Each structure stands twice: as structure tokens, then as C-alpha cells.
Amino acid sequence: MYKEKDFDIIVVGAGHAGCEAALATAKMGLQTALFTIYLETIAQLSCNPAIGGLAKGHLVREIDALGGIMAKVTDMAGIQFRMLNRSKGPAVWSLRAQADRILYNIYMRKILESTENLAIKQAMVEEIVVENGKVKGIITSLGVFYGAKAVIITPGTFLNGLIHIGLDSFEAGRAGEFPSKKLSESIKKLGLKMGRLKTGTPPRIDAKTIDFSKTEEQGGDDPPIPFSYSTKKINNPQVPCYITYTNEKTHEIILNNLDRSPLYSGKIKGIGPRYCPSIEDKVVKFRDKSRHQIFLEPEGLSRKEYYANGIPTSLPYDVQVAFVRTIPGLEDAEIMRPGYAIEYDFVYPTQIRHTLEVKGIEGLYLAGQINGTSGYEEAAAQGLMAGINAALKIKKQPPLILGRDEAYIGVLIDDLVTKGTQEPYRMFTSRAEFRLLLRHDNADLRLRDYGYKIGLVDEETYEEFNKKKELLQREIKRLKTTTIKPSEELNKALIEAQTTPVEEATFLDKLLKRPELNYDFIKKFAPSEVTLTKELEELVEIHIKYEGYIAKQMELVERMKQFEEKLIPENFDFNIPGLSREVIQKLTEVAPRTIGQAMRIPGVTPAAISILMVAVQKKTTVKK
């Protein structure tokens, strides 16, 4: 075995989790090595060429607020931006961007290669070296040992990856790339319980063979709203997507060929994503639906490939061709790449801590699909937090654990380590109890201070943020302390807006709280002395309009804090008289760090929590 130089931190896998982890640790001043099987596929958009979407957009904004990179690269590579759910309340507004697959890879690699303290290595990592419960480094397929104080594993779908197209299957981590088999064996040897998951991707269509006149064009927002708080302008040309639908003929072909589907023949054992089902699943489970929506998404400005979002499939190639050509606009479609399903190994995430460090193995961190999640954004968020916490531990500083009331990232990680998952986990706004506090628009107000404190947000960015915060507070104060007197012009405008006129001097915030009025109306009659950006105006309006609801959620957060702050001692014995065997087993497996976390474990009843609280109180009293 050949011994190479040591690093502070080694990151294995250069997907979305790995890139965030490596950049975070390097920016925090630690010597970092990022290992990838193939340099050309760094930050590959393996499935759809898009970032964000419902709740996922929140994660990207939070990554940006903490000092991560995904939002900035998306803005550099974005070719269409849309704010989703505008017709609903601001808590569920989410930004989504179509990204140029080639540009995304180019910009991310350029950033990685220009980052100090970061070395990038093309090598197959096969073994994690652990001695006396502490990570020591990794060994590559060439027998090279690299030492490290911490190792972050972010392998995506590569652990024992197996691709299925019809009844044919072959080993791969992604189409055309080697799987990682020995690394999976190494993880199992460490005693970690592993399972099998599955995901899928649709066929890609040659644009020259699509009749777009038979589809519905869907453009983006104009002007486009960037993901990153630092981005001033989107520079790429913006292009549309196109909508079409399956039909009964499509469904008939699929149903007639289920015997050739690896999903329905029993060949695939892994559990697939509930919220991103294959077209086979949709047709079988929703037989009452005569059609399913398809979004034709451009893969990039320099590519003639379209991603057929809505028809992920693992049916044989000939069946894919047959059913695709029944779809309006795709009658003459040529498939450039067939759809496929991929099975891969994952680690049951109740075996990791909130820091994403593996319980019982000091210095080993897991992030991304290995923890049972699906999606680029969920992976990137975990990668960032694993990197931050690995760096903080080496620096002998307290960990950064985000609460469920602070960030969707906090909800994501707490769900994984507390509840675990048996299927690919996807983030939704409905998973957050405090979603009115965790809005897309206020991610920087929630998290920027953390990013600055740990060293991921630079002075200039932080200064700009503080100026924005000051302007926001000043304008809210002005609206709360300034009155407007009745006038003929004002009351005429109020009547036109279908709201009641004012008869006496009224505070501006009271007017703005009216559902019929917006900030533009207030600005017309009582403009601010300082010009606010559109983003700030929106933030002011949301704060004023939802002030009462926000206050109620804050009260609930404060009530819950008593449980979140009630710590359970390390290595606590949950074998408590009065608890059922099932509850003891669940508490022992998860090893919650607080009473609040214990309350969220499925199957742990309120009665069990009462018994646990008494036992914890006794233990802490005895210690004192």
C-alpha cells in the first residue's frame, strides 16, 4: 500500500452533496480532498435539468444564506426561472429554475478548482479505514492510502448501483459510469445497517423530432428572480418548456407490457420514490385518469435534448419508443437516451447524529442519497451541514444544528435521524410545522448570521445583509408609526380597490393589512424616503400582513422549546420500567438527544414521554 499525503477532511463523491461539503470545509480553512470516480461528471444533474421547486427551492435559498454554492451556480446556469404557488400564501412560494446541464457542471468545477485548501482527485475509493472507533482515512482501488481526521461519504446512487431497462440489467452508478461496490462492502463491515432504494429517469428526446405546435408553451418569470441573494442579474437567455399529455393509447401500451417491466416482474427489490412514481406506476395506480401531464424541459442552450418530465420508466426500449410516439407532439420522436431505473444501497439514517456523523464512529459523516433522501437540493443541504460540522469538530467548536423552527434543513435532518425512512425521502412544505416562519423570502434573515459566524459568509456579503436588515426594520417601523389622513383621492382609490374608505387618520400598517391592498398602494400615497428593492418591498408586505399569524407560530415555538432544551444524557439507558419493549427498542435505536426529539419518534406515546421525563430528571438530579 502506498501512503499519500494526509488531509484534514476527505470528501468521497463529487455530486451535489460532495461539492457543498468540500467547498464548506475548504472555505473554513481545512485542507480538503474531494474524490470522484470521473472528473467530467462533477455536480452532474443526473436526472432532471432543474433546481428547486416546492420546498426544494427553500432548501436552495437556505444553502445560499449559510454560504453554500448551489444557488449561485444555478443562477449562472439558469435558463428559466419560475416562482411556484404565487396564487397561495407566501409560506409555500417556491422558486424553480431550469438549468443548463453543461453550464452547471462547468461553473461548479471552475469554482472547485479555484478554491484554496481544496484538492480534487479522480480515484475509486474502496475502503474507509477506522481504528478504535475513529476514522483514519481511505484507501483507493490503486491501493493508495490517504489519511484524514474526518471522512464525508456522499456516493449518490453509486453504492452497488444496478440499472434496469426492461428485463435487462447491468451494474452502474449512473448510465455509462462504474458503480462503487467495495465501498458499500466497507460500510457494511463497519456494522451499519443498510437497505436498498430505487429511483428512475425518463427518456430524453431529440428536439428536431418534436412537433412543438402540438404542445403548450410555458415560459418563465420576466424578469427572472435569482436563487442567490448575491446575484444581481440573470445573464443567460431564457427559454420555454412545453407541456403535453399521455392518453389512453399510451396507457394501453404500458399496461400490455407490464410483464416486461422490472418493476412489476419482481426484478426490482428496492423501494421507489412515492412522490416521483414511474409512468408504469401512475397508469396502474390511477386507472381512472385518462391522461398524465408531461413537461418537455430543455437540457441546455447548446443541446437539442429534451427531458420528458413525467414519464420516468424502466420499460424495455421498444416499449418506450412505442408509448412515447402516442403522445401529442412526439409522434415522430427519436429517443436519444432511454429511461431507466436504478437500485442502490443506502444507510438507515437513524444511525447518524444531527451533525450527520455516524454514531459510534468518530469522524465519519454521511450525506445525500446514502441517508435515504432523493433530490439534488436535499443532498446539497446535507453535504453543506456535514462539511460544516466536520470542520467545526476538528476546530473544537460547537456543532451547528438547525432547529425545525429555523430552517427546512433542520426539518430534513431531524426527520431523517429521528423518524428514519424506508423510501426515498423528499422535502415538502407540509413536513414543516412552522412553515410561515420558514419562508423562501426570509432565509437570509434566519440563517445569514450562522454563515458569517462559521466563516462561510464574507465581510462584504454580511455588510450588505445588515444594510438590508436595517432598511427592512426601518420601513416596518415607519409603517407602524406613520398615519395617513382621509382625502378624496385616497378614499376614491380605496373604493376602486373594493375596500372601505377611511374616516380618520389611519396607521399605514393597518391599511396594508387589508387583503385588497398591497405595498404599491401604500407607496403611492405615502412613499418611503429610501428606495427599496422589489424584494424588500415584498418582505415588508409579508411581515405586516402576516404579523398576527407569525406571532402565533413564535408562541408555539417558545412553548416547544422547553422540550427541545430538556437534554437527555449521553449513553442514557432507555431500559426504563413502565416502557413497552417496542418503545425501549425505538428510543435505544434513535438515542434522542432531547425530550423534544423523543416526542417525534413514531410510536413513542405521550405516556412513554412522561415516564422518560421522570427517568431523565432522576438521572440528572443524581449527577448533581
Curated annotation (Swiss-Prot):
Residues that, per the record, bind NAD(+): 272-286
Binding site for FAD: 13-18, 125, 180, 369
DNA repair among keywords: no
Cofactor(s) listed in the protein's UniProt record: FAD
Domain of life: Bacteria
Record has NAD as a keyword: yes
Family: Belongs to the MnmG family.
Name of the featured protein: tRNA uridine 5-carboxymethylaminomethyl modification enzyme MnmG
Organism: Thermodesulfovibrio yellowstonii (strain ATCC 51303 / DSM 11347 / YP87)
Gene: mnmG
